[in-house]
Amino acid sequence: MTRDRPTLLARVLILPIRGYQRWISPLFPPVCRFYPSCSSYAVEALRVHGAGRGLWLTIRRLGKCHPFHPGGLDPVPPRRNESGTEISDARPGSDGEASPGAPGL
């Protein structure tokens, strides 16, 4: 679900997040109430959606990070095209299931 390569601005925004993940986050116990963690969510959102929408999704996610929110599974939404339908990078039959008409499966 990621773009072939994040935009330049998205890569610039990812750098400080990676720095936080590498040097600051290990100093503290894991306390994130979400999966994936907020920093991992931010990196994935920027890669999948680019700088504009990825930053917006990250800000929304950080806004939910408080003691009164239950947390839990909160994946990055899939990328959509101009008509609003999901863009899938998967090819038919690549999910491990046999495709219709596959002999012997």
Curated annotation (Swiss-Prot):
Protein's recorded name: Putative membrane protein insertion efficiency factor
Compartments in which it is found: Cell membrane
Similarity-based family: Belongs to the UPF0161 family.
GO-annotated cellular components: plasma membrane
Pfam families tied to this protein: YidD
Reported function: Could be involved in insertion of integral membrane proteins into the membrane.
Ranges of compositional bias, category Basic and acidic residues: 77-94
PANTHER family in the record: MEMBRANE PROTEIN INSERTION EFFICIENCY FACTOR-RELATED
SMART domains: Haemolytic
Alphabetized UniProt keyword annotations: Cell membrane, Membrane
Superkingdom assignment: Bacteria
Keyword Membrane: yes
Region (Disordered) location: 68-105
HAMAP family: UPF0161_YidD
Source organism: Thermobifida fusca (strain YX)
Membrane topology category: Peripheral membrane protein
